[in-house]
A protein has these predicted regions:
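HhH-family (HhH-GPD) DNA N-glycosylase catalytic core used in base-excision repair
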Residues: 1-259
């Protein structure tokens, strides 16, 4: 959420930070250097060279992707909490962004922990699996999840009892993971209420598999309009998910006449 002074408030789990753009490559953050280096540095994925990733795109061979990369240089794939991301994408199915945001806010206020940020503003942590599993039917109903309600509860229960092991799926520490992308998607689709689209979104944004390539209505339009002969997915491994985000953001701007 954007604050009155132009700073952005970012909540991750039980943490909250304000980030304000102060100039080219200069940002002001509302935490000390110890907290930033121990948590937010990794969360913002600052050790990944997105300049290197953009540099792999040839301007002449793929002008649209090159243009997208140049126009959307600020995009990063955050290293978000896997459980929080999975629940959020389960909630997102067949909904628009304002309704998704409201349901997540309601879930957090119903089951999360009430906290206060550095500016004295109250916020709620995203609930842990045990907090969601312990919710009454009435409390969960107040979150306006609709048919997704049992998906959310059963996912929380699965993480609690170990039948859903997100740690085994993550590639956040690639040196300790040999999980293939295809295997991850298959495993995610075995979770109650998770289909291919949610699985691909979860793989990219929750497990940091940078080659995952979620396809929604906007990406379908991009592929049909800009790549009628087929998108060269093999040429862009292992960063297809990053390129998808560049194209998605740039194409949305073009469609609104903002680029």
């Amino acid at each position: 959420n954007e604050a009155e002074d132009g700073a952005w408030r970012v909540i991750s789990g039980d943490r909250c930070i304000y980030i304000k753009h102060e100039g080219e490559s200069c940002f002001d953050v509302s935490c000390d250097s110890t907290e930033f280096e121990s948590y937010w540095h990794r969360y913002l994925d600052l050790d990944t060279s997105y300049r290197m990733i953009r540099g792999k795109v040839d301007r002449n061979r793929d002008p649209f992707l090159y243009e997208s990369c140049m126009d959307e240089q600020g995009i990063r794939i955050l290293r978000q909490n896997p459980f929080e991301t999975l629940i959020s994408f389960i909630i997102s199915q067949n909904r628009n962004i304002p309704i998704i945001r409201r349901s997540i806010e309601l879930l957090s206020s119903e089951a999360g922990t009430e906290l206060v940020d550095t500016r004295g503003v109250t916020y709620y942590s995203f609930p842990e699996p045990w907090q969601i599993a312990a919710m009454s039917g009435e409390a969960l109903g107040r979150c306006r999840l609709g048919y997704r309600e049992p998906y959310v509860r059963r996912t929380a229960e699965g993480v609690l009892d170990g039948s859903i092991d997100l740690a085994k799926m993550t590639c956040a520490d690639k040196s300790a993971s040999d999980v293939s992308e295809a295997g991850t998607i298959k495993g995610l689709c075995q979770i109650y209420g998770v289909g291919p689209k949610v699985a691909n979104c979860m793989s990219l944004f929750g497990l940091h598999h940078l080659d995952a390539f979620p396809i929604d209505v906007w990406v379908k339009r991009i592929l049909a309009g800009k790549y009628p002969d087929g998108y060269p997915i093999e040429s862009y491994r292992p960063y297809n998910g990053v390129y998808q985000q560049y194209m998605f953001a740039h194409y949305r701007k073009l469609s609104k006449g903002q680029a």
